[in-house]
């Protein structure tokens, strides 16, 4: 049942790099970044504390290097840098809306942004700032989905909001299979057991271990984030039962 007030006080939003790309084939669509920032600003206006993890696939994917015979570790480091670019872009969009925002990077680059620590993240959240986590986990072989689950646990998030291209988790790709059905809710174990493409195995397992729900929704629906924060909207909830 939908309420006029948010049912979460502190959340982690995971946005893929592809989401920032919009209809372009590469890079950042500023209009899309501005719209996502507007949705985050709406959540802040409701009093919700928001942390954000952004991917880097719109600029570079580390696995692309490995698939062509290159060094995976170097490729992943390049992908981490791509997430910093995206984090800075989203922070710029938020600041245009007068939303106090800080970027915390898992890779030290003090001339560009602050370095991540749990203490810093909790301090900034308590001060009402949006905290954007960049650089993934800071380690190769871990996806930004895993970074999202890790940061959610560290910041004490009540839920992970996974913004995707569709409005929830489906039995198959709804863009390819018209008979695909959307799940209203699942358990973490069901997601892992069915091999559903939500987040990678490590991310879902970490969320399960820390009893953090994962809410999958369409990041392209303007105002959808705030609507789901109040219990409405189309989504799939992954939680313990």
UniProtKB/Swiss-Prot annotation:
UMP binds at residues 56, 76, 137-144. InterPro entries: AceGlu_kinase-like_sf (IPR036393), Asp/Glu/Uridylate_kinase (IPR001048), Uridylate_kinase (IPR011817), Uridylate_kinase_bac (IPR015963). ATP binds at residues 14-17, 57, 61, 164-165, 170, 173. The keyword Nucleotidyltransferase does not apply. Signal peptide: none annotated. GO terms for biological process: 'de novo' CTP biosynthetic process; UDP biosynthetic process. Allosterically activated by GTP. Inhibited by UTP. Keywords: Allosteric enzyme, ATP-binding, Cytoplasm, Kinase, Nucleotide-binding, Pyrimidine biosynthesis, Transferase. The keyword Lipid metabolism does not apply. Its EC number is 2.7.4.22. Its main location: cytoplasm. GO terms for molecular function: ATP binding; UMP kinase activity. One of its GO terms (cellular component) is cytosol. Residues 22-27 are annotated as: Involved in allosteric activation by GTP. Pathway: Pyrimidine metabolism; CTP biosynthesis via de novo pathway; UDP from UMP (UMPK route): step 1/1. Catalyzes the reversible phosphorylation of UMP to UDP. Homohexamer. Belongs to the UMP kinase family. HAMAP family: PyrH_B. This is Uridylate kinase. It comes from Agrobacterium fabrum (strain C58 / ATCC 33970). The lineage of its organism: Bacteria, Pseudomonadati, Pseudomonadota, Alphaproteobacteria, Hyphomicrobiales.
């Amino acid at each position: 049942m939908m309420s006029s007030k948010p049912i979460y006080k502190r959340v982690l939003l995971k946005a893929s790099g592809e989401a920032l790309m919009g209809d372009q084939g590469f890079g950042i669509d500023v209009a899309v970044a501005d719209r996502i920032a507007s949705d985050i600003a709406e959540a802040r206006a409701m009093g919700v504390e928001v942390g954000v993890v952004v991917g880097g696939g719109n600029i570079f994917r580390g696995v692309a290097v490995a698939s062509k015979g290159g060094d995976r570790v170097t490729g992943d480091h390049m992908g981490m840098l791509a997430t910093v670019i995206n984090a800075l872009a989203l922070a710029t969009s938020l600041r245009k809306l007068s939303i106090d925002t800080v970027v915390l990077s898992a890779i030290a680059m003090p001339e560009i942004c602050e370095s991540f620590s749990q203490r810093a993240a909790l301090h900034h959240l308590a001060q009402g700032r949006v905290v954007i986590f960049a650089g993934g986990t800071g380690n190769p072989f871990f996806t930004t989905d895993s970074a999202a689950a890790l940061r959610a646990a560290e910041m004490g998030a009540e839920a992970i909001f996974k913004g995707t291209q569709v409005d929830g988790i489906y039995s198959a790709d709804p863009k390819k299979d018209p008979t695909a059905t959307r799940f209203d809710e699942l358990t973490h174990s069901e997601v892992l057991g069915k091999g559903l493409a939500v987040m990678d195995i490590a991310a879902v397992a970490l969320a399960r271990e820390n009893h953090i729900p994962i809410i999958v929704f369409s990041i392209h629906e303007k105002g959808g984030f705030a609507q789901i924060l109040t219990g409405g909207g189309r989504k799939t909830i992954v939680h313990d039962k």
